Regions:
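Signature of N-terminal electron-transfer/Fe-S-associated modules in redox systems
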Residues: 1-186
Length: 186
């Protein structure tokens, strides 16, 4: 059975890549904990518009964990406290407690300049993905894959890398902030 929670959303507001940004806060009341994080942001925007304020800008597309457009920093973590490998749209309010302060920020990387609020320009990153050449060195002659025994633990860990959807969390979270280190597995 869903419970309702109330909390404070502290969200990033910025008019563009060179504008000075700041945090705004809004009290959210009686939000069902089976609400997705993006649905909660939709409710936030409805409340902001009803009170005559400008809505909070964030990006999203599929809302199914496929595209990665919903990528946000939530409480200092890419995508927030989701299940392993999940995206922001797969985060539900049951991960939060009544009375929490939830901080929402854009990706913090020069490779993702801010368009407005938490919407970032992903075009440089998209070009790397579209180029398809994530590895730029020759690997030589590889043995037949069936001839190399791989322990199950290593195979399971490798599968985590194969689930990449190109959201950019690795680049945003990396202190190097370099999209050139991106090694998407496909």
């Amino acid at each position: 059975m869903a419970r309702n929670i109330s909390f404070t959303v502290k969200y990033w507001k910025q008019d563009g890549p060179t504008a000075q940004g700041h945090f705004d806060t809004h009290e959210m009341k009686n939000i069902p904990d089976d609400t997705s994080f993006l649905e909660m942001l939709d409710i936030l925007n409805e409340e902001l518009i009803e009170s005559g304020q400008e809505p909070f800008v964030f990006d999203h597309d599929c809302r199914e964990g496929i595209c990665g457009m919903c990528s946000l920093y939530i409480n200092g973590t890419p995508h927030g406290k989701t299940e392993r490998g999940a995206t922001t749209c797969q985060l539900y309010m049951r991960r939060f407690n009544d009375g929490d302060v939830i901080t929402v920020e854009p990706w913090r990387s020069a490779g993702f300049p801010i368009i407005k609020d938490c919407m970032v320009d992903r075009s440089a990153f998209d070009k790397i993905i579209q180029a398809g050449g994530y590895t730029s060195i020759r690997t030589g002659q590889a043995q037949d894959a069936n001839a190399i025994l791989i322990p199950k633990e290593n195979a399971d860990e490798a599968m985590d890398c194969a689930t990449c959807i190109g959201c950019g969390a690795c680049v945003a979270a990396c202190k190097n902030g370099s999209a050139m280190l991106f090694v998407r597995s496909e």
